[in-house]
């Protein structure tokens, strides 16, 4: 344990400096079995040439972001086969790297911490073909993870557009249909006391997992395992972004509007994959 502790200190900055993904672990058969449990799959709508860098906005957060995790840092749902030549990763909560051994699993999969420093490192590092997924709604959006609902926290999230402009990284919307369906969660409408309490916890700790219920190993109604319900990660067409070293607020806002429109179009075009009624639409807050 002493040697492990010393190694952790020496390697402390690894999650914010590109991590250290191991191909054999990312491609291990266990991830295919994991994907088959739900099942999970990726749908490609356009090519992502490896001569560009990409910031992939993943929606919705859900309870655990299972679709984004499986697509971006494992081979389980087929992302590497559909987009050859890309080096994919995902920005995840810094706390994922605070716990012994769990930290090493995250690093081995190539996950990086969600911070300005880590995103800048990835985009400034020489070479192209990086596909960096960010679950843009974060902990706030996780509180809206209810089956059959499609509520996103995105209106005020514009930093990703600024970085896309600054480094000339194309934006790609990705919607994980079914992400909100794998757990049942308690009602917590905006403005309710339950929601206010959850937001109070989130403001103190940075996270507040939704109060949820899944299934057990030997039953289908009570437990912490996710329900076996399909998740389909639809990867949209890239929005070409030209590099602007010092983008203006107007440029950021215009790119944000273009991204939101592309995301809504992606949802409307592919919602039939999960039999979502025609009168159900994406709500962006």
Q: Regions from the language model: what does each represent?
A:
Residues 271-285:
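C-terminal helix/juxtamembrane-tail motif
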Residues 231-234, 250-267, 273:
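Pol beta-like nucleotidyltransferase catalytic core
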Residues 1-32:
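N-terminal membrane-anchoring alpha-helices
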Residues 42, 168, 243, 263, ...:
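Eukaryotic basic, amphipathic alpha-helical target segments in cytosolic regions
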Residues 26-234, 238-239, 245-247:
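Soluble catalytic domains of membrane acyltransferases
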């Amino acid at each position: 344990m002493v040697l492990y502790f010393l190694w952790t200190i020496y390697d402390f900055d690894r999650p914010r400096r590109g991590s250290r993904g191991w191909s054999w672990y990312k491609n291990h058969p266990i991830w295919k079995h994991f994907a088959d449990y739900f099942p999970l799959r990726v749908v490609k709508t356009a090519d992502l040439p490896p001569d560009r860098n990409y910031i992939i906005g993943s929606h919705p957060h859900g309870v655990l972001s299972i679709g984004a995790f499986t697509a971006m840092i494992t081979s389980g749902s087929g992302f590497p086969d559909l987009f050859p030549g890309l080096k994919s990763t995902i920005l995840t909560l810094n706390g994922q790297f605070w716990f012994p051994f769990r930290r090493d699993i995250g690093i081995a999969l190539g996950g990086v911490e969600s911070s300005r420093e880590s995103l800048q490192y990835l985009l400034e590092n020489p070479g192209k073909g990086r596909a960096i997924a960010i679950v843009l709604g974060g902990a706030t959006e996780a509180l809206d993870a209810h089956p059959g609902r499609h509520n996103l926290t995105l209106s005020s999230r514009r930093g990703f557009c600024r970085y896309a402009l600054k480094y000339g990284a194309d934006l790609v919307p990705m919607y994980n249909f079914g992400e909100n369906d794998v757990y049942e969660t308690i009602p917590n409408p905006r403005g309710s006391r339950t929601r206010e309490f959850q937001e109070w916890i989130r403001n103190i700790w940075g996270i507040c997992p939704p109060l949820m219920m899944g299934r057990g190993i030997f039953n289908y109604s009570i437990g912490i395992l996710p329900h076996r319900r399909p998740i389909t990660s639809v990867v949209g067409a890239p929005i070409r972004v030209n590099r602007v070293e010092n983008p203006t607020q107007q440029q950021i806002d215009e790119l944000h509007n273009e991204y939101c429109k592309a995301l809504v179009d992606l949802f409307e075009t592919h919602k039939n994959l999960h039999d979502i009624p025609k009168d159900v639409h994406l709500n962006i807050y």
